[in-house]
Amino acid sequence: MILCVNRRVLHTVTIDTPAGEFTMLGDNSRLYGAGFTGDLARVMASIRALPDDVGWEIRPGANQLLEQAVDAVKQYFEGNFEPVASFPIWQQGTPFRHQVWSTLRQTKAGQRLSYSQLADASGFPGATRAAATTCAVNSVGLFIPCHRVIRADGSIGKFGWNQQVKVDLIEHEARLARRP
């Protein structure tokens, strides 16, 4: 007897950006992973789970969705932040985490907020540590802009992909968000 296992294909692409290499992973409908690294294994490690219990096959090279994602990232670095903010993504999480990620996607480029402000804006006052953990497990960097979250004392804080990348993204957004 031959067993046929349903397999889904995930495509992956790495591009050069002003903030360094950026790798994305997605199927035909949404992104599952994205981060400032050329190391696909690192992006894969950031993904907590994939939907469904089917097999996944990783294929290098962009499909139509990743071509659109590449365009969205290029537009981001040209100062058009909307395509990244509204791009289709998926990541597993609790209702709390999904609310925090949704709040982050609604923040404006150039806006910075503390972890406690993020928790408050998400409807969970006092859940500062949980909001910080939610940022730490974000598997779709840039598309969920955790880089906009700073410490209450105004310092930059940590960033899973590289602290200098966080600084560069904050400065990029501050500079371009002020444009007329």
Model-inferred region functions:
Residues V70, C135, Q163:
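Short amphipathic alpha-helical/adjacent loop interface patches that line ligand
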Residues L50-D53, I150, Q163:
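Short glycine/proline- and charge-enriched loop/turn segments
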Residues A152-P180:
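…primarily DNA-binding HTH/wHTH and HhH modules…
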Residues M1-P125, H172-P180:
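Basic nucleic-acid-binding alpha-helical/helix-turn surface characteristic of O6-alkylguanine DNA
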Residues L142-V149:
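Short Lys/Arg-enriched helix C-cap and helix-to-coil transition segments
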Residues R129-G141:
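Regulatory, non-catalytic segments
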